[in-house]
Structure formats: C-alpha cells, structure tokens
Amino acid sequence: MQALNSRSEIELLVNTFYDKVKQDPLLAPLFAHVDWPHHLPVMYNFWASMLLGDRSYTGNPFQKHMPLPLTPMHFSRWLELFNQTVDENFTGAKAEEVKARAQSIATVFQFKLNLTP
C-alpha cells in the first residue's frame, strides 16, 4: 500500500478505478462511448486539483453528467468501486480524503439531479 500524495499515484487510482468501471455490468454501458485517451487525463487533472491543489482541472463536471440516464444505483456502485479501488491500493490521510470527496460529489450530483428523496 502506498500514500496518495502525487500525480503518479492519482493516475494509478484513476486508471485502476476505470478498469473496474469498464468491466462493471451496471456502469460500463454509461461509459461505452467514452474517448478514454481524452477522458483519463481530464480525470487525472480533476483529482489532482482536488487532492493536490494544482489547479490543472478546468471544467464543469456536473454539466457533463446531466444528459446521462443516472440513477441512485449508479452512484452507489460508482462509490463502491471507487472506495474499493482506494482501499486496495492506498493508505493515509489523502486516501481517506479522496473517499470523502467522492462521497460529497455523489451526494451533490444526486441532489442536483433530483435523485434524492
């Protein structure tokens, strides 16, 4: 296990997580048409901005997700795979922080999409 303190570790997290997503029966269809060579660097920048404060990400993540047919089950599975990936590969304060941030993002997105009771 390693800490989650550098861009290379964030890239490992993102790559490992999306490898799981691509194999997941519930989530894979949502990502079937993703341009991975373009999408992965965007995700590296997003999480590096969140965890390292490097401000490499510019964009509106919510806007990108609005047209998708998302349900609470999608968010639950996304979080399950994300947390599993973190727990299998990383330890320390940043590992806990990234899981908390993912939970917060999922909560806000579901609220904005009217997917919460």
Residue spans for each PLM region:
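Core of compact, soluble alpha-helical bundle domains
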Residues: M1-P117
